[in-house]
Design a protein with these regions (language model features):
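Catalytic core of pol beta-like nucleotidyltransferases
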Residues: 2-112, 116-127, 136-211
Length: 211
C-alpha cells in the first residue's frame, strides 16, 4: 500500500495549484512563503527537502531552472518566460506609480496607498491596470476619492470603456484607517483574501497602516 501524502506535501501541492491559476511557476522560497493551509509552520529547509525526495509530488510537478509548476500541456519553461515578461511590465508600471505617489502625498486625507492584484504580484500584462488600495482619514473617503481620481480622469489616465489607455490608474479599493480589518468581507477559510492582504505593496504610508 502506498504511503499517504503528508500534510506538507498536500500544502505544497495546494500552493502550486493556487499559483497555477495565474500561470505562474514558483520557487522553493515562494512555495514556503505562501504555503496554503499547513497544519503547522514549516521551515524552508523542510519544504526544500520534501520537494527533492517526494515521489508523490514529483509525479505531479515539473521543475525548470528552480521553478515548479503543475505537469501539463504548458511547460515550466514557457510559463517562466511569460512570467519574466510580466515582471518587466510590472516594473515599468511601478516606476509610473512611484512618480504618481508624489501627488498622493499632497492630499492630507489620503493616509496610505498600496498596489494590489496582479501588480502586487509583479504579474501584469500590457493591458493591465495599475490597481490601488487607498486608506483615508475617517469621514473623508468620498472627498479624498474625488481629489485623488480627478487629475487622472482629466489626463485620460483612468480605465476607459471606449478605448484603451496604457497603464491606467484604477483606484479599486478604499477604506478608512479605522476600518482596516476585513473579516466581514471574508469567506470561511478565504484563501484569496489571505493572499490579497499579504501581497499588498505599500507605495507610501503616513501612519504605519500597513505595518
Amino acid at each position: 500500500m502506498d504511503a499517504q501524502p503528508t500534510d506538507l506535501e498536500h500544502a505544497i501541492l495546494k500552493t502550486v495549484l493556487w499559483f497555477s491559476m495565474f500561470s505562474q511557476p514558483v520557487t522553493v522560497f515562494e512555495i514556503w512563503k505562501w504555503l496554503v493551509q499547513p497544519v503547522r509552520a514549516y521551515d524552508l529547509c523542510e519544504v526544500q527537502a520534501i520537494l527533492e525526495r517526494s515521489g508523490w509530488l514529483q509525479e505531479k510537478l515539473e521543475l525548470f531552472q528552480g521553478h515548479y509548476a503543475l505537469k501539463g500541456t504548458v511547460t515550466v519553461e514557457h510559463l517562466l518566460a511569460a512570467r519574466q515578461d510580466r515582471f518587466l511590465d510590472a516594473e515599468r508600471k511601478f516606476k509610473r506609480l512611484r512618480r504618481a505617489a508624489r501627488f498622493f502625498r499632497l492630499l492630507p486625507g489620503v493616509r496610505a496607498v498600496a498596489a494590489v492584484n496582479t501588480l502586487a504580484w509583479w504579474g501584469t500584462g500590457a493591458e493591465s491596470d495599475i490597481d490601488l488600495y487607498v486608506v483615508t482619514r475617517a469621514g473623508q473617503i468620498w472627498s479624498s476619492r474625488f481629489w485623488l481620481v480627478l487629475p487622472f480622469a482629466l489626463l485620460g489616465a483612468r480605465p476607459q470603456a471606449d478605448h484603451e489607455s496604457q497603464d491606467p490608474f484604477c483606484f479599486s479599493f478604499f477604506s478608512t484607517h479605522e476600518t482596516l480589518q476585513m473579516e466581514e468581507l471574508c469567506f470561511p477559510r478565504d484563501t484569496y483574501m489571505a493572499f490579497w492582504v499579504k501581497s499588498l505593496v505599500p507605495v507610501f504610508d503616513r501612519d504605519g497602516c500597513f505595518s
